[in-house]
């Protein structure tokens, strides 16, 4: 592939960077005997040479396009590598693409009542994680501020109704300061800041922010 690219660059340099002999020929027309000659004949000759020069230029461009197409049509040709190579050869200025945002996880992971704001939890910034996911049922955890779960909730209720709020609200009871959490297999009502690691029955993790 590197050999093909080198040949392509050599072809461009040979055909487009060298001096055009026809252009030189136009600038060095021989003088007639005694310095005379027909002006109309000179104009006709110049027009013919200009037409020939244009024809040769088009032929060179067609040959170059054909060479590029042949390289593109090879089965092992890597277009991305070619574009990268062409970009580097056309300019010495490197433009760095903006870095994508790096995902962050809570450490430790906190649950809390509605009085605690949600966000990325750390030892110094105690916030409730709002990107929780259950590794048991592979559901994202939903939470409802100022609600608690009714004591009659069971596994089948969440299994059949998650994550539709209009179905879940039949088991939600208003309670100021509480926050009701649930996935398809587990549920909790939390009022105080709680480290998730202290609840060994829950298989919830931070799904990254």
From Swiss-Prot:
Main localisation: cytoplasm
Disruption phenotype: No visible phenotype. However mice exhibit progressive and simultaneous degeneration of rod and cone photoreceptors.
Sequence ranges of Basic and acidic residues compositional bias: 40-58
InterPro entries referenced in this protein's UniProt entry, alphabetically: CFAP418 (IPR029239)
Gene Ontology biological-process entries: photoreceptor cell morphogenesis
Organism domain of life: Eukaryota
Subcellular localization(s) per the UniProt record: Cytoplasm; Photoreceptor inner segment
Tissue spec: Expressed in multiple tissues, including the brain, kidney, lung, spleen, heart, trachea and testis. Expressed in the retina (at protein level).
GO cellular component, one term: cytoplasm
Required for interaction with FAM161A as annotated region, ranges: 1-76
Keyword field: Cytoplasm
KW Cytoplasm (keyword) present: yes
Annotated segments matching region Disordered: 24-58
Assembly, per entry: Interacts (via N-terminus) with FAM161A (via central region); the interaction is direct.
Known function: May be involved in photoreceptor outer segment disk morphogenesis.
Stated name of the protein: Cilia- and flagella-associated protein 418
Source species: Mus musculus
Taxon lineage: Eukaryota, Metazoa, Chordata, Craniata, Vertebrata
